[in-house]
């Protein structure tokens, strides 16, 4: 689906001359950057930890123990994360817990900032001719509201979110968009912050770079065997190095 942006129409661009890396490490021309949202562009890990700790505290359960442990146990499907956090689905069903979580998260999500340098990175990549979109496990309405509030909606050709609150999978979103808009997945780089983002990239057939600033630790991300950067601010330099190394 193609959603209207804040800018008065998105420019049609010629294919970008920047080089990327596909799953085999072979240079490929990039047309698109496909971004994850939560943890990749939006700095929401502190909020996620605070909301979950509040839920645990209300039930007399131990806290998560900080962001470092959170990054070690957060996973998809999120049911497994809730179990690791200490919830017993025999006492409360996952759906009830997930709705409680998302209601509190949504009330506070607009207070979350973008990661340092994220807006500047989006602007720089747009200036280089790359088309950008977001594929997220967030609900569609919440995604649109958060991206708009952050002031970066105009950088994206599309925002692709899920239709429920349970964040089961987003694997089909990229494939559907690529098919509907004749996007060559070999010319797409997916940038995310979880192993699920890597799985989505694999299924879609595009390259992947992961960021260690988000919802999973560098140790876990490195198991994917793709480049892991410390932060979104490093993306332009990384892409520039790929271009220079394959020119």
Task: Annotate each predicted stretch with a short phrase.
Residues 170-199:
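Conserved Lys-Pro-Asp/Glu-containing loop-to-beta segment of HAD-superfamily phosphomonoesterases
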Residues 62, 152-157, 184, 229:
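Conserved H-loop
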Residues 69-70, 153-168:
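A short, structured active-site edge motif that brings together acidic residues
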Residues 30-120:
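N-terminal helical cap/lid subdomain that shapes the substrate entry/recognition surface
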Residues 6, 12-35, 187, 247:
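Non-catalytic pre-domain segments flanking phosphatase-related domains
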Residues 107-134, 140-144, 171:
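Short, acidic loop-to-helix structural element flanking the phosphoryl-transfer center
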Residues 189-227:
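Acidic, Mg2+-coordinating phosphoryl-transfer loop and its flanking beta/alpha structural elements
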Residues 128-130, 180-185, 242:
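Glycine-rich phosphate-binding loop signature in dinucleotide/nucleotide-binding domains
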């Amino acid at each position: 689906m193609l959603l209207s942006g804040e800018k008065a129409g998105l420019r049609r661009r010629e294919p970008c001359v920047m080089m990327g890396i596909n799953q085999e490490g072979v240079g490929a021309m990039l047309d698109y950057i496909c971004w994850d949202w939560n943890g990749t562009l939006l700095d929401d890990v502190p909020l996620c930890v605070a909301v979950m700790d509040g839920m645990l505290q209300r039930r007399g359960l131990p806290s998560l123990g900080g962001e470092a442990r959170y990054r070690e146990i957060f996973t998809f499907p999120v049911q497994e994360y809730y179990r690791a956090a200490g919830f017993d689905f025999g006492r409360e069903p996952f759906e009830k817990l997930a709705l409680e979580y998302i209601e509190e998260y949504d009330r506070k999500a607009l207070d979350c900032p973008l990661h340092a340098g994220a807006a500047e990175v989006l602007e720089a990549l747009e200036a280089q001719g790359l088309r950008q979109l977001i594929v997220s496990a967030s609900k569609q309405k919440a995604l649109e509201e958060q991206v708009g509030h952050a002031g970066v909606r105009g950088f994206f050709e599309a925002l692709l979110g899920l239709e429920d609150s349970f964040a089961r999978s987003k694997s089909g979103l990229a494939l559907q968009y690529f098919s509907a808009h004749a996007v060559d997945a070999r010319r797409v780089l997916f940038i995310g912050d979880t192993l699920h983002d890597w799985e989505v990239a694999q299924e879609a057939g595009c390259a992947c770079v992961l960021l260690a600033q988000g919802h999973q630790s560098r140790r876990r991300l490195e198991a994917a065997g793709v480049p892991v950067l410390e932060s979104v601010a490093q993306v332009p330099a990384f892409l520039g190095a790929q271009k220079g190394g394959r020119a």
